[in-house]
């Protein structure tokens, strides 16, 4: 299954300006906030979480929340994700792939998920 999302970086900048750290805590885990220092990185993480939720055909809501999706970077800087809080078993995840990019004022993410 494939999910994709795109977000304007300016939208994330406005969220940060208006709500600050509390705004970020609504959708980022503490470990993610350590990595996502720039608005374009935050926007990429937002898009990635939305893309994962779309790939699972659930969206963000009761079944899957922002804090159930952990976005991280490998040693080489490639983005990856894990589902937390038992969601990996619930959705029967076998294999995943994630790509995040940002350019021209937008961040885009594509998530690929293979289920058992």
Curated annotation (Swiss-Prot):
One of its GO terms (biological process) is fatty acid biosynthetic process. Its EC number is 2.7.8.7. Its main location: cytoplasm. This is Holo-[acyl-carrier-protein] synthase. Keywords: Cytoplasm, Fatty acid biosynthesis, Fatty acid metabolism, Lipid biosynthesis, Lipid metabolism, Magnesium, Metal-binding, Transferase. The gene is acpS. Mg(2+) binds at residues 5, 50. Signal peptide: none annotated.
